[in-house]
Amino acid sequence: MRILWLSVNKGLYKTNKQEEKGYHGGGWISSLQQLIIHTHDNTLALTYVTHTPMRKEVQDNTIYYPIYEAPKSSWQKAIEYYGGYKKIDCKKYLHQIQQIIQDFQPDIIHLFGMENPMATILGKTTVPVVVHLQGLLSPCNNAFFPVGFNKSSFLFPLSIREWLLRNGYIFAKNSIHVRSERELSLFKKVKYAMGRTEWDYQVSQLLAPQSQYFHVDEVLRKPFYENAGKWECPDMQDYKIISTLSNTIYKGLDTILKTAKLLKTQSNIPFKWIIAGISPQDPIVRFFERKLHITGKLVNVEYIGVQDANQLCSKLLQSHVYVHPSYIDNSPNSICEAQLLGLPVIGTFVGGVSSLIKHGDTGLLVPANAPFELTYLLKICFTEKDYATQLGKQGYKEAVQRHDKTKILKDLIHTYQDIIKQNKNPHDTL
């Protein structure tokens, strides 16, 4: 079976350059790739977009097809920033992908995410395409601004520099709106969808009622399997809460700040709230702290920046509870990784999170933007340690089954084979 992946993440591909710094999302794609490349009778090719000129190359039993896109000049960035994002290129990367299809001759194409710019291939090839549902843009667009915020929140900066920074979020909102409209039209061309939550099933069947849905769970990063079930309630004076965020408006930093303030002023519980993924200098930190008049440091919030898998695993094992405060999400692997370690988890009842957490059994659910309820649940976890530990144990049992590598690989291969059987002579492009 010849499998072509279209991914914004280059997977296991290694360059001669030093390891890249920055956001560490997408590691699960590399983990899934590790499973595929060690199977028999399967050939994997991976296509990704790069700003560095590169050629087709074979590594790790994978054929890599880089698509080169020249870096944008400052002028091009300015044009896109102030309205150019509205001009969606419906044929972007299409010619290159069709050439790759001709060269590799895949039996099936696996497209990672409807938000993937390579989704232009949908409806343009006779090779069956299965879409791996990730962050769905239309629901994200709907939940973009937290309660109490809108575009006008970003229009009155104190300096020219902040005007540029804050309008970066307005640009992000405008961009996600335009891309979500494109996503809606592309969903009409989806024949096969792959997901793992009740939420992504519902959204896909609403926007692509003609599509066939396959349930395939996701592989997590290696250190979390190596430390599965090893969490024990830390014996320390201060309680540690941990969250993993990106510098995105709807990830819930505002909820954390409001909850931390409540926890400090309405209880005598000593705590520290660790936030991985963003640094103290991040513009989103300055924005929310100023708008809410809450300084993170004064309410025991500590920003530790981006952590690799080993660092994050260590931080989680040293914490008492994991909190996921996002306003929208499908199946956040940060929750899954915490559960696999055995850590008690509190997540917002949004998107697909309720498919990961059964309230009162494998974790706790709280409404989005509910700092009072979240503060109460945190106090329960701190004062009723046996209850919190039991939540962690049940979450671990669920996560071990959900993220079983053997089962995931079996489900994925079966999905590929099922789709291929439904299609004949898939190698010609339209």
Which functions belong to the PLM regions below?
Residues 32, 154-193, 202, 206:
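Membrane-proximal helix-turn-helix segments that form the acceptor-binding/catalytic region
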Residues 1-56, 428-430:
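N-terminal subdomain of nucleotide-sugar transferases
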Residues 373, 380, 387-402, 408-414, ...:
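A short, well-ordered alpha-helix in the C-terminal region of glycosyltransferases
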Residues 359-360, 364-371, 380-385:
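Conserved acidic donor-binding segment of nucleotide-sugar-dependent glycosyltransferases
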Residues 4, 232-251, 257-260:
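Conserved donor-binding/catalytic core segment of Leloir-type glycosyltransferases
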Residues 285-310:
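Nucleotide-activated donor-binding/catalytic signature segment of Leloir-type glycosyltransferases, i.e.
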Residues 344-347:
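Short hydrophobic beta-strand element within catalytic cores of glycosyltransferases
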Residues 327:
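Aromatic "clamp/platform" in nucleotide-sugar-dependent glycosyltransferases that forms part
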